[in-house]
Amino acid sequence: TGTFNNANPMVIVDGVEASMNDLDPNDIQSVSVLKDAASSAIYGSKAANGVILVTTKRGKAGKASINYSANFGWQSPTELPEYVTSAQYATLTNEARAYAGKTPLYTAEQIQKYADGSDPYNYPNTNWQDLLYTESGFQQQHNISINGGDEKVRYMTSVGYQGQDGIIKHASKDQYNVRVNVDANPTSKLESNFSISYSNIALEEPTNPYVGGLAQIFRQVNMISPMVPYKKEDGTYGTIGDGNPIAWIDMDATTNKKRHNMLGVGSLKYSFLPELSIKGQASYKLYAEDSNEMRKDIQYNPNKYHGPNQMWQKDTFEDQVMGDIM
């Protein structure tokens, strides 16, 4: 869901604001969505774009059970824009010039060479998207959980791993999750709940020496003309003013991020009467991220250079303690 400024809905996990990216999908029991005005009344201005309520799995009374699940898959672009070929571009350019009363820019022989690929270095027809999306996009997911307890104490603990290879070179994600949920009823009137979760996420993505970041690579791939060769006959790169996006991929320059996220939630509820109770809840959130971006210089050809080498590093640390009485 998104509105102005690409705003996202608020995510509440077991009563505390969190991120869906840090969850193991195997730990989710239920998901519900609030979109009416009541959500803003309950959660404030952050809920203006709706609220996603996530409940994680809890322990059940009974003999301890161990469960393992795994799945595997591959990703590919579902739909890509179709761009004109070099021959089509040349033909359309000539037509536009004819409407303007100008002479053709391309001869019939040149258009034919663009179309038949007989001289790919001088009359290229580069499919930049084919050069970008070269990887399998293999992904895997594993989760093992233990569930059990009795009427007094119940527990659910799980360990998960998600591995995801990108559909472009040097793009990957590895995520590890650990969760422990414990529920207890020491007396008929007292109920306690405790949850602690931890996620460790490692991300890698290609960057570039032009302005840095992955977004610029996608931008240039969707802008550069098919008439620009990926490489020339002498092995140097064809370029536009901004460079060559596939040359950036070839440089093996990457941004690497490591994220650590921990969330602990505890609550106590005392019921005086079936209709009257008091509940206290406290939570602690910790987030840390290390980001390193290596921008490598590149000599595309004798006349075009981007550089010099640069290393960008950013460290982030945040923690938060919250409490409520309801």
PLM regions with names:
Residues 3-4, 18-20, 37-42, 59-62, ...:
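Short beta-strands and strand-coil junctions in structured, solvent-facing domains, enriched
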Residues 60-125, 136, 166-173, 177-263, ...:
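Surface-exposed loop/interface segments of Gram-negative outer-membrane beta-barrel transport/assembly proteins
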Residues 23-26, 43-48, 171-174, 208-210:
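Short, glycine-/polar-rich solvent-exposed loops and beta-turns at beta-strand/coil boundaries
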Residues 53, 67, 143-147, 158, ...:
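Outer-membrane beta-barrel architecture
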Residues 149-152, 184-188, 270-276:
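Outer-membrane beta-barrel strand-turn architecture
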Residues 6-8, 26-28, 37, 47-51, ...:
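Extracytoplasmic
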Residues 9, 14-41:
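Short acidic/polar hinge/loop motifs at secondary-structure boundaries
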Residues 1, 14, 47-70, 142-144:
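N-terminal periplasmic accessory domains that precede
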